[in-house]
């Protein structure tokens, strides 16, 4: 189930913590010719005995003229170490971007080391937040200052 693979990655991702996309989004992607799915499976003999044979990785990519954008990835983590399914799905994305003649491939913001090995360049990440009520932030800041003062006056951690 491709949606289950997506949710595996989504559940473990804390760099960008968002809500789960509804199943309908994936259905809509499937109807739009600008969206592509790359599905990675193993040869039959590679599946462990008793394990259901199915996709071990998927990527949902968007083709916008000269730009290829892998937007979402899904993984079966049981195959991450043994078959390096994340590395393989990234390589398949690079191959597909070349096949469609994409001039630019936007890989996303996580797993920088793996993507650099495929020739990606990392750019600094910046985010801005507008806070309507800063009470909690100010409280945390006061706690940090108090903790720092305790360390400085005692000569060690509080």
PLM segments and residue spans:
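A conserved beta-strand-loop-helix scaffold within acyl/acetyltransferase catalytic domains
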Residues: 1-81
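Long hydrophobic alpha-helices with heptad-repeat/coiled-coil character
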Residues: 1-9, 24, 91, 95, ...
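Detector for Asparagine
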Residues: 8, 17, 28-30, 85, ...
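Residue-identity detector for threonine
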Residues: 18, 41, 95, 104, ...
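Glutamate identity and glutamate-enriched acidic tracts
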Residues: 24, 36, 44-46, 52, ...
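Acyl-donor binding region in acyl/amide transferases
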Residues: 65-129
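Terminal substrate-recognition subdomain of acyl/acetyltransferases
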Residues: 109-158
């Amino acid at each position: 189930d491709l949606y289950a693979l997506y949710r595996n990655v989504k559940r473990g991702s804390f760099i960008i913590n968002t809500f789960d996309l509804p199943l309908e989004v994936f259905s809509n992607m499937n109807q739009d010719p600008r969206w592509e799915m790359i599905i990675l499976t193993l040869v039959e003999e590679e599946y462990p005995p008793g394990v259901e044979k199915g996709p071990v990785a998927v990527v949902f990519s968007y083709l916008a003229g000269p730009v290829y954008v892998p937007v979402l990835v899904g993984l079966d983590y049981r195959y991450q170490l043994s078959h390096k399914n994340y590395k393989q799905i990234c390589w398949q994305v690079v191959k597909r971007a070349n096949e469609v003649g994409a001039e630019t491939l936007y890989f996303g913001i996580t797993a920088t080391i793996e993507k650099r090995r495929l020739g990606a360049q990392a750019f600094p990440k910046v985010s801005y937040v507008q806070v309507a009520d800063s009470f909690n932030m100010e409280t945390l800041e006061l706690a940090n200052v108090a903790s720092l003062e305790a360390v400085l006056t005692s000569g060690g951690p509080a």
